[in-house]
Amino acid sequence: MKILTVFMIFIANFLNMMQVFSVKDRFLIINGSYELCVYAENLGEDCENLCKQQKATDGFCRQPHCFCTDMPDNYATRPDTVDPIM
């Protein structure tokens, strides 16, 4: 019985650590919409700087949008949507 208890505590701690160390790769969202990089001259540099401002580790242009690596967990997964007026 002790072995089962120790194993369950180990699993609980392991799952808790996995949640802390999880990171996300996301398309960059600024002002509620995806950031376009299609027509920019310095595609890689602009996306990299914008992503780092959002606390990502790196960014690049994955046309037509900027793509950021290792985004914070609380970063939006979708752009803002507006309900249509009826």
Swiss-Prot record:
One of the record's GO cellular component terms: extracellular region
Tissue: Expressed by the venom gland.
One Pfam family hit: Toxin_3
Coiled coil: none
Sample GO molecular function, one term: sodium channel inhibitor activity
Signal peptide per UniProt: 1-22
Alphabetical UniProt keywords: Disulfide bond, Ion channel impairing toxin, Neurotoxin, Secreted, Signal, Toxin, Voltage-gated sodium channel impairing toxin
Effect after changing residue 74 to D: In mesotoxin-2
LCN-type CS-alpha/beta domain boundaries: 24-86
Localisation per UniProt entry: Secreted
Predominant cellular place of this UniProt entry's protein: secreted
Disulfide bonds: 37-61, 47-66, 51-68
Entry-linked InterPro entries: LCN-type_CS_alpha_beta_dom, Scorpion_toxin-like_sf, Scorpion_toxinL/defensin
Similarity-based family: Belongs to the long (3 C-C) scorpion toxin superfamily. Sodium channel inhibitor family. Beta subfamily.
Main function: Binds to sodium channels (Nav) and affects the channel activation process.
Record remark on domains: Has the structural arrangement of an alpha-helix connected to antiparallel beta-sheets by disulfide bonds (CS-alpha/beta).
UniProt name for this protein: Mesotoxin-1
Organism of this sequence: Olivierus martensii
